[in-house]
């Protein structure tokens, strides 16, 4: 929005220069995009009066004039302007004048006739040309007065970018209000007096829609629509980028820019009956002031009479009821339209008007009467007329409510991060137009003014305090962090985990936490997943209880595209339904999931690839857990969706942290998959295992002893290893299986298992007797527990 600096200073005039004024507006949140002079610098141009006009003897298009500039003898000037005439007043560039573009005026001759200056058009003094020819000045323009002074060309135009929340600042009044508060000055508005009614004639107004809580109208008769717009008004409008049209249009535009209230004048003779503010009917048509034909529908609010639509409310008037040069009587409108009733309607018709721009953001609902009085005052002053009483139609229940907001000193300090004086807070809010009541020391109850639609919560009030106190006054201090920061080590370990899995040939998948109900039931029939109220698709309708319900579709997608080796992992969240008595008990568990199909290694030239098996997957799991140097155990898994003979639970310190294995063949068949290997582990357990626990390495020699056992093939190897570890005690450092044999020499139903046992003491060398005693105890326990026997060498 563009405004004249001099116009703004008639409302509030702080003792600061133009640049500082622009900086203050920007710091108030009214960002100044440009501060530019009304006209470029020039000198030596004054108001002149044409005394005589004679034809040039040697040029048909030139004439010789004498011009009075109020200083000595009249000047002889040769001019070719078509509108040149005796008695007119126009700008005169005298000898020595320098016009924009460094154009210097010198004494010269045109076709043999001496010319002592130049009569100027608008463009020659950096103004917009309205006509072809000289810039005609009013008859009362003082001869000899510097044209820059007379036309106020030493003024500046301030171009301000108004944010959507500050609809109240689309006017001189709104900007002056904030500027006055910042500089602790009083606003000096024009003296607006109500124009008394001189005739008793009114239009009935019916409010038939909730979008128009307040509507004012006034009949004005015998208006001189051909009256000349005063120069000061034309200059103010020109500075705002608004062309002058006629006195009525110029007055309503002036009130729009001055007070921020859109207004409209209808030709009274073209209105039939009462005024109705209503919603349009489907397919109602209207020709707008810009000659655009539009078709309306039920969500468009209109102004109508008893017979037809007159205007789109808050956007643009209709051509049929518009004021023309033949208009004598008018009906003047000033209203409050609800922002939501106007928002988006103008753009629907490809329009963007000053009126819609303001109503969309919110116009002060207490402003229509003041604006009506101001417009009436200006019309009476410059166009005359007889005025009827002001008709007020309103539904106060539909006017915006001004709710009380509680504010205290602590809230201000906490949000801003520094102390603002109590008196300043109350004073600033009061000067901004808020109603401020003291509740207690440092506590207030505040009601926002009618023009501020953006103040609804206490944070909005604190923002106002900060604006007026000055953003540049915010103290420089180090931030105070009250929140608990995430441990960097956790992020480091998570990144390390991702990198470890990626080096094993898996690609990371990132999927939704939503899953297909059917797949969830196939994986775990006992689970009743939480259904989404508004799923994005039918196959993403529940919250997943396992990451496999997200990874399996990824595998299917890739297999269907000729990818015969697929390996994915995901670090994500799953819902734990097991211990949830209600929805409120549900918890999400960070989980690592693996899925693999195809060969154990990519196809290679130097060797035959083998299908992936249980031990390949177990190797990957052990690589993932190896960084933690924790002791991992495996026991048979009883999960229904896993292969009963090729799956296991993963234990650390006796607690299950997940599982690994092959999907059950029947499930593979249902899902149209080949042999598919999967694993799921508790992510937190993995990261906790990464915590380093250092123990001093023994400097004393270790001793290895091997035993080969004949034992039933029904007994799990993990159970045997667990028993060996428990029996061996602290001196047994580790044990592992290194040979399995069945066949000749081993009776049916049994197998030979060979274990290595590593013995070591942390602070001394073990004696043979100690090792022998330990070995004997282990063999005895195995014999008694599993009927194991030593295999003969």
UniProtKB/Swiss-Prot annotation:
Family per similarity comment: Belongs to the phenylalanyl-tRNA synthetase beta subunit family. Type 1 subfamily.
UniProt xrefs under Gene3D superfamilies: 3.30.56.10, Bira Bifunctional Protein, Domain 2, Ferrodoxin-fold anticodon-binding domain, Nucleic acid-binding proteins, Phenylalanyl-trna Synthetase, Chain B, domain 3
NCBIfam families registered for this protein in UniProt: pheT_bact, YtpR
Subcellular location, record wording: Cytoplasm
Enzyme Commission (EC) number: 6.1.1.20
Name assigned to this protein: Phenylalanine--tRNA ligase beta subunit
GO biological process, any: phenylalanyl-tRNA aminoacylation
Any GO CC annotation of this UniProt entry: phenylalanine-tRNA ligase complex
UniProt KW Cytoplasm keyword: yes
Cofactor dependency: Mg(2+)
Source organism of this protein record: Acinetobacter baylyi (strain ATCC 33305 / BD413 / ADP1)
Occurrences of domain B5 (ranges): 400-476
Domain tRNA-binding intervals: 39-148
Cofactor comment: Binds 2 magnesium ions per tetramer.
Pfam families: B3_4 (PF03483), B5 (PF03484), FDX-ACB (PF03147), tRNA_bind (PF01588), tRNA_synthFbeta (PF17759)
Superkingdom in the source lineage: Bacteria
Catalyzed reactions per annotation: tRNA(Phe) + L-phenylalanine + ATP = L-phenylalanyl-tRNA(Phe) + AMP + diphosphate + H(+)
Keyword annotations: Aminoacyl-tRNA synthetase, ATP-binding, Cytoplasm, Ligase, Magnesium, Metal-binding, Nucleotide-binding, Protein biosynthesis, RNA-binding, tRNA-binding
Single GO MF descriptor: ATP binding
Subunit structure: Tetramer of two alpha and two beta subunits.
Domain annotation FDX-ACB: ranges: 698-791
Residues that bind Mg(2+): 454, 460, 463-464
